[in-house]
Amino acid sequence: MNEETNNEFKKNLEKFKKMAKRGKETKMDKKPQIIVVGRSNVGKSTLVRLITKKDVRVGKKPGVTLKINKYDVGNFILVDLPGFGFMTGLEEKVQNKIKKEIVQYIEDNKDQIVGSIILIDVKAFPGIVERWDSKDEIPIDIEMFEFLEELELNPSIFINKMDKIKKNDQDKTLDKIVAIFGCPAPWRQWINDIITIGILKEGIGLNEVMVKINKNVNEYNRVKNKK
């Protein structure tokens, strides 16, 4: 990484850290938040663009999103967190700092976060898990899911890029994926509850995501209005 690129990454990282630390001070009107998390290049920015209908930078290279991006969608705030995993051009120690800041932001804002969406790539994910298993380590995707569950932040998993696997292999692959997240097969029993499948580049799966978001936001407002 050349000096100019390195300085730009450091600048973005400092902005990210400041936003994460300010957390509660930067909430828009104290509206409920929906966070979007996942590895780099799984379709996070595409999902954000579909929900917000705003021009969101979408890149083919991993690690396009390097800072927290918040979008006011009316009755809730959509928060696009940096992709974890491999990030183009970033040193490992910088990547680890960003991961810590993601966790810090979630912890600082847990009272406002009413739902969380973890995106995964249906074709790439099983191989990622196998590589981590070979090192006797838990993939960060699973750690994040368990972390969000522990905080009761209503995590759901969006399995993206369904067009990348053959139809004959879909049931077997999806059964394997839900089992990895601790949900017994068959995968269909979890559809539109914990699991949503789709092809975001074609907008497939967006309606199901919005149903979940609205359900979580409405429940938050119902409880809040009772107080």
UniProtKB/Swiss-Prot annotation:
Domain of life: Archaea
Keyword Cell cycle listed: yes
EngB-type G domain residues: 30-219
Binding site for GTP: 38-45, 63-67, 80-83, 160-163, 197-199
Keywords: Cell cycle, Cell division, GTP-binding, Magnesium, Metal-binding, Nucleotide-binding, Septation
Signal peptide limits: none
Positions annotated to bind Mg(2+): S45, T65
Entry GO MF terms: GTP binding; metal ion binding
Needed cofactors: Mg(2+)
NCBIfam families, A to Z: PRK04213.1
Protein role: Necessary for normal cell division and for the maintenance of normal septation.
Name of the protein in its database record: Probable GTP-binding protein EngB
Organism for this UniProt entry: Methanococcus aeolicus (strain ATCC BAA-1280 / DSM 17508 / OCM 812 / Nankai-3)
Gene that encodes it: engB
